């Protein structure tokens, strides 16, 4: 009987250790950034999903076709043109307005330093009302590999996504990060 209990306990401990290792690995394969924005959910949704909204705080130029398979094309340079080699193209995978949308990089800019890692990641952006007139925005990027290039890109977006949220918070004059990304 003791031997049976000992084997059962050992199996349970191994299962818990395996689950914890998987959870730690999964965390290393994603980026999560969030901020509380001093604006209502519908307004923040519009700031992310309309050309005028995105151009008011994030990029110099944009075109957004918010539908399944539609493109979000953005350009950070005023002198650039949508469609040139500096354009970033993302394809919408899903959306539930005004709560969330997901997208995948379909064409990075020509100077993007990560030749292959972008091909496996996708982004989910959540918009949660937290109190009257305020919205929690969470950006999660998933699908990173454990290879060097993918982890370098993960660090790039850990900084970049939080910077993006900080810019949005500044637009609404409430620089209140809910949490910073984990140390890289």
Which residues are covered by each model-predicted region?
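Bacterial N-terminal signal peptides that target proteins for export
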Residues: 1-10
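Hydrophobic/aromatic beta-strand elements that line small-molecule binding cavities or substrate pockets
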Residues: 33-35, 61, 87-94, 120-129
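A short, structured loop/turn motif at beta-sheet edges
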Residues: 38-42, 66, 93-101, 126-136, ...
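Short, highly charged C-terminal tails/helix-capping segments
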Residues: 170-184
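Beta-strand/loop substructures that line and gate deep hydrophobic ligand-binding cavities in soluble
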Residues: 111-159
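Amphipathic alpha-helical segments
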Residues: 38-57
């Amino acid at each position: 009987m003791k031997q049976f209990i000992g084997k059962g306990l050992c199996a349970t401990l191994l299962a818990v250790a395996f689950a914890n290792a998987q959870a730690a690995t999964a965390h290393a394969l994603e980026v999560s950034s969030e901020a509380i924005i001093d604006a209502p959910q519908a307004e923040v949704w519009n700031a992310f999903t309309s050309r005028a909204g995105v151009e008011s705080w994030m990029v110099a130029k944009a075109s957004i076709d918010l539908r399944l398979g539609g493109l979000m094309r953005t350009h950070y340079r005023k002198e650039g043109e949508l469609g040139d080699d500096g354009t970033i193209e993302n394809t919408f995978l899903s959306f539930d307005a005004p709560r969330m949308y997901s997208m995948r990089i379909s064409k990075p800019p020509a100077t993007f330093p990560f030749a292959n890692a972008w091909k496996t990641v996708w982004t989910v952006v959540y918009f949660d009302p937290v109190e009257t007139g305020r919205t929690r925005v969470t950006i999660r990027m998933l699908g990173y590999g454990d290879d060097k290039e993918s982890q370098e890109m993960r660090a790039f977006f850990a900084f970049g996504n939080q910077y993006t949220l900080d810019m949005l918070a500044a637009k609404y004059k409430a620089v209140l990060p809910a949490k910073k990304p984990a140390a890289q």
